[in-house]
């Protein structure tokens, strides 16, 4: 079992430069404490996430830590050009000596997608094409691709990752019917939610994995479970701290939905 941190970098009420510095100091603490990895969210136009460009913040994390693995959870591929993602991934992996964990996803907020002119209902094909191009660019020295959204002919890729063929891939998983793709492609998954549906997902993952891979259980990709946790001297103190932090985070979480008259 490994322990990591997932951070939205949501607005905290302090000056933004101090907000970033506070988080970087926390990353240094996670590094010294022996945490496995530090993951950050990507959000746009909302106080839920101040690391709108994950690569910029993670470049600082790479320089402030020595052993801690880190990465986006996730890069929103439907909002970014795949060649830029390829190049930033390679740079981060090189700058950290091969410590990048690569989270990828389509994006979950229709309002944030709309800021970029992307229709959330039609974003799946865009995401799939972008993912295919990113994986090609991380594995090969030249990109040739013909799709609906992207067309590339003999595009050279001069950068490369330390980790071969790619850094570890992470994918957020909320439904068991999405498991086969992740298990077949040996992608690490992370889940939220109650224990029962999460168990359904992880059981299904192990089942599909065993059908397609024969390397043994020690090669099974990681399956993460997200939980809000506060450690304090007493339950009462922990609850008090947790409520203060959770109330602020949840207000930020609802921000765009409330602004569009769709409160959660």
Regions found by a protein language model. Give the residues of each.
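An alpha-helical appendage that flanks or caps ligand/catalytic pockets
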Residues: 123-157, 196-264
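Flexible, glycine-rich active-site loops centered on histidine and acidic residues
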Residues: 2-16, 78-145, 149, 189-197
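Active-site mouth loops of central-metabolism enzymes
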Residues: 7-21, 75-83, 121, 163-173, ...
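Hydrophobic faces of well-ordered beta-strands that scaffold small-molecule active sites
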Residues: 3-7, 38-40, 69-73, 100-104, ...
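A conserved active-site cap/scaffold subdomain adjacent to cofactor or substrate pockets
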Residues: 175-195
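N-terminal beta1-alpha1-beta2 module of alpha/beta enzyme domains
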Residues: 1-70, 164-167
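Acidic (Asp/Glu)-rich catalytic clusters
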Residues: 31-32, 58-67, 89-100, 183-184, ...
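Conserved, mostly hydrophobic/aromatic
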Residues: 3, 30, 34, 42, ...
């Amino acid at each position: 079992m490994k322990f990591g941190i997932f951070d939205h970098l949501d607005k905290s009420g302090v000056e933004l430069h101090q907000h970033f510095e506070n988080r970087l100091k926390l990353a240094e603490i996670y590094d010294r404490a022996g945490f496995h990895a530090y993951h950050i969210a990507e959000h746009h136009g909302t106080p839920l996430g101040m690391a709108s460009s994950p690569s910029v913040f993670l470049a600082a994390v790479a320089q402030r830590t020595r052993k801690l693995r880190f990465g986006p959870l996730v890069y929103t591929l439907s909002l970014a050009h795949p060649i830029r993602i390829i190049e930033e991934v390679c740079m981060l992996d090189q700058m950290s000596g091969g410590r990048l964990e690569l989270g990828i996803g389509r994006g979950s907020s229709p309002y944030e997608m709309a800021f970029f002119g992307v229709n959330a209902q039609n974003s799946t094909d865009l995401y799939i094409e972008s993912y295919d191009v990113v994986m090609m660019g991380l594995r090969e020295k030249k990109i040739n691709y013909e799709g609906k959204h992207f067309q590339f002919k003999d595009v050279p890729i001069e950068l490369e990752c330390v980790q071969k063929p790619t850094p570890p891939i992470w994918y957020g998983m909320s439904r068991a019917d999405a498991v086969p793709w992740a298990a077949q492609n040996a992608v690490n998954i992370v889940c939220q939610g109650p224990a029962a549906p999460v168990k359904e997902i992880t059981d299904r993952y192990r089942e599909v994995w065993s059908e397609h891979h024969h390397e043994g259980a020690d090669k099974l990709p990681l399956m993460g479970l997200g939980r809000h946790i506060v450690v304090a001297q007493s339950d009462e103190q922990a609850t008090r701290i947790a409520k203060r932090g959770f109330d602020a985070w949840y207000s930020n979480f609802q921000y765009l939905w409330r602004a569009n008259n769709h409160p959660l």
